[in-house]
């Protein structure tokens, strides 16, 4: 939990209080079987449920010497990327909302729903999917999955330009964001910032490229 003292856009003081959302997951896992521990991973971060469960599955599979079929590896990779899009769209939409750009906020949530619908149709869950299992996945993809993913990709490409026109390319948004919350490349590396945060600071550390897993080395 972060308690902030602000002066306009400048954070003057920041007090960190740890423990408010600590749930002792590592301790809980000591008394669970390997399959039982998987239920906890989806709840670590509802915007990264697929990736968290995937990571633990890979750890267990490596320890047990389980070979995962290539089709499963492709399914896991695609699901991870859909979840990543879900996460980025929520970030974009909430940033817009915090800055009062409600039109852009609604656009972001509109398109995030399309991703969640695709995930739900195959996994049965929108946020917590419990889809990956040790050595595989709970069930094969829905018959409409491939078609809907392709349709979403074709839909989303021009929409990104629309986002830029209404928000990221807007002079008001740019003036408010420039110089606010600056994170240097050195601090990004020191703090372990990755993804979009790291790239914005000049630190392009992408584990999918540096240490490919699943089928990231092939796509």
Question: What are these model-derived regions, one by one?
Answer:
Residues 1, 5-219:
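Active-site bordering "gate/hinge" segments
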């Amino acid at each position: 939990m972060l308690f902030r003292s602000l002066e306009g856009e400048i954070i003057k003081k920041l007090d960190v209080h740890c423990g408010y959302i600590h749930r002792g997951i590592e301790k809980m896992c000591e008394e669970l079987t390997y399959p039982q521990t998987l239920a906890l991973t989806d709840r670590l971060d509802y915007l990264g449920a697929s990736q968290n469960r995937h990571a633990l599955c890979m750890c267990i599979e490596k320890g047990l010497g389980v070979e995962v079929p290539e089709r499963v590896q492709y399914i896991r990779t695609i699901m991870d990327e859909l979840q990543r899009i879900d996460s980025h769209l929520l970030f974009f939409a909430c940033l817009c909302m915090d800055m009062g750009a409600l039109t852009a906020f609604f656009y972001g949530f509109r398109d995030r729903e399309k991703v969640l619908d695709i995930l739900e149709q195959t996994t049965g869950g929108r946020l917590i999917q419990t889809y990956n299992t040790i050595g595989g996945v709970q069930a094969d993809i829905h018959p409409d999955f491939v078609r809907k993913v392709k349709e979403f990709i074709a839909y989303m490409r021009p929409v990104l330009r629309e986002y830029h026109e209404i928000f990221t390319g807007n002079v008001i948004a740019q003036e408010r964001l420039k110089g606010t919350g600056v994170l240097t490349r050195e601090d990004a590396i020191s703090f372990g910032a990755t993804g979009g945060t790291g790239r914005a600071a000049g630190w392009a550390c992408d584990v999918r490229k540096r240490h490919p897993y699943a089928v990231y080395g092939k796509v």
